Amino acid sequence: MKVTSKCSMTMANIAKPKEWYDERIAYLSEFMLPERFATMQRVVADRTRYMTVCAENTFHPQNASALVRHCEAFGVQELHAIEFLCGFQANLHIVRGTDKWVDIKRYGSTAEAVAHLKGEGYRIVAATPHTNDMTPDSFDVSKGKFCLVFGTEKQGISPEIMEVADEFIKIPMYGFVESLNVSACAAILIQGLVEKLHCGEVDWRLSPEESSELLYRWTRESVKDDEGILRKRFGEDF
């Protein structure tokens, strides 16, 4: 599994005490506009890993880009990309930098992605009509963490995902159209389910430790010569 991030992930993957991150955040914030840092603090407070998204072999860059933007806009911190048929390639003109704020985890097979997600305690929720499907209104977000899986543009959800899915979800249709494209479907489902989390009693936010680790990475993304600054002040070895 590969993790995509502009900022070096080496230190982020090592467990550090919350105080370690907070000390460096406080120092780096001195090199930022106060308004910018306040915005980051606000956004981190609304981030979640309780819900995540998985894209299976997304061919079109515009759809990959839209998925990244949807996740960022609605506070979903992680996006999982299965890439055994094609790479998950976002269009820079569409994402407009939002990929800096979302962690994209990449997998070479569906089995690898499912094993990781199941190992992290996620329910696999396939976005496709099914005999036992649910709608955003009827889906129970309180049953535990869940991952929304979106299939490829033409074939939809793969047989491998259909076999291991814990639940299925669809968007009710009332016209002649029987389906929406990946981007539209993702926007509706992600927004609807995030709204349910915000309105419910589920503890969906990041832990204090996760929030500090993420804010540390974001402040590093936003400060020029962050490595030099941290090395000079804290003696960091990158």
Language-model regions, residue ranges each:
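Post-transcriptional modification and biogenesis factors for structured RNAs
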Residues: M1-F238
